[in-house]
Amino acid sequence: MSKRDYYEVLGVSKSASKDEIKKAYRKLSKKYHPDINKEAGSDEKFKEVKEAYETLSDDQKRSQYDQFGHTDPNQGFGGGGFGGGGDFGGFGGFDDIFSSIFGGGARRRDPNAPRQGADLQYTMTLSFEEAAFGKEATIEIPREESCETCHGSGAKPGTDAKTCSHCGGSGQLNVEQSTPFGKVVNRRVCNYCSGTGKQIDHKCSTCGGSGKVRKRKKINVTIPAGVDDGQQLRVSGQGEPGVNGGPPGDLFVVFHVRSHEFFERDGDDIYCEMPLTFAQAALGDEIEVPTLHGKVKLKVPAGTQTGTKFRLKGKGVKNVRGYGQGDQHIVVRVVTPTNLTDNQKDIIRKFAEVSGNKPDEQEMSFFDKVKRAFKGE
C-alpha cells in the first residue's frame, strides 16, 4: 500500500509555515493518540501523523521530500527492473565497473570498522503541569545489550570466533562478471559470514551467536520545565550498543502532553476564561484567578464587557531553552443569570426602567458597526 502524501496527512498546504505544520500535528496527535482514542486504526493514524511531522518539521528532510517524495534519492534507479537493489543487481555498482577498468578501486565501508549503534525512541505522556514544571522520571525501555555469557563475541565460552576462510576477514568477496565493458571484478558482501569477516563454529547458547541479547533497561530522565507536546529530548548514549566497539546510539524521548480542563497553552503563554456575574461586570470586583503558580488576585474594573482581556505577566510557562517566562492571558465571560426568582426578576425590571432600554455609548458604537455591515459600508 502506497504512502499518503505527508501534507495531506496533516491537512496543510505545501506552502504551510512551520507554525501551521506544528499546530496541525498537535491537533491530530491529540485526536489519534492511543491513550485518548481507543477506536480501531487510531494507532496507525497516530504513527502516520507522527511520521509526516518528523519529515515536514525538518527543513532538510522537507526539502528532500518536496523534491523526491517518498522515494529515497540515495537509491538511484534501484528497484526499476535491473535485478533488484540500488546497485543494479547483476551488473554491480558503477563504482565497481569503472574502478575495475581504470584502477584504484572504489572505497567500501570496512565491515569490521566500529559503527555507532542505532537510535531508540520512547513516547512519554505528561500531565499539563508536569510539562510546565518538569520532573525526574525513570523509564524502562527494551534494547539490545552485549551478551554477558560470551562478552559480545557470539562464540560459546571457551571457544573463539575465527577469521572467515572465504573472504579472509574482509567481509567481501571478489566475483568476476561479464559486462558490456568486458570482464570486471565486482566486490560483494561475503555470504558466508554476512560481511562480519568472522565465522563462529560453536555459537553462544544465550545469544545464538549474535553477541547481543534484548533486555529491559531502566533509565533516569530529567525532563526540563517548559517542554511542549511533540517536542523530544535527546539522551546521549542510551540507544542500541555500538558495533565492533563503536559508540552507542542515542535515546530520543518524545513528549505527549495531556490537555487541561481549564488552561490552554500556546508556546510559553497560558490562556483561560473567567466567568463574571452581571453584578461583578457592572460594578467591578476583585476576583481570584487560578494560575499554574497558585491563585492570583485580579481587579476587574466597573463596566467590564464580555471578551475583555487581562494579562498576568510572568504567570505562564518557563521557556524550555531558558529564554524567560510566558504570561497568562484571561478572557472575561459575563454569565447571564438563569432560573431567576420572582424577586430577582422584579429587581432587574426596576433596573431596566431606571436605566432605560437604550444601549450606552460603547454599545451604540458596536450597533453602528453592525448597521454599517448590513448596509455594505
Curated annotation (Swiss-Prot):
Cofactor-binding details, from the entry: Binds 2 Zn(2+) ions per monomer.
Binding site for Zn(2+) 2: C164, C167, C190, C193
GO cellular component, one term: cytoplasm
Residues annotated for Zn(2+) 1 binding in this entry: C147, C150, C204, C207
Location(s) in or outside the cell: Cytoplasm
Chief site of localization: cytoplasm
Residue stretches of each CXXCXGXG motif repeat: 147-154, 164-171, 190-197, 204-211
Cofactor(s) required for function per UniProt: Zn(2+)
One GO biological process term: chaperone cofactor-dependent protein refolding
Free-text comment about domains: The J domain is necessary and sufficient to stimulate DnaK ATPase activity. Zinc center 1 plays an important role in the autonomous, DnaK-independent chaperone activity of DnaJ. Zinc center 2 is essential for interaction with DnaK and for DnaJ activity.
Name the record gives this protein: Chaperone protein DnaJ
Protein's organism: Bacillus pumilus (strain SAFR-032)
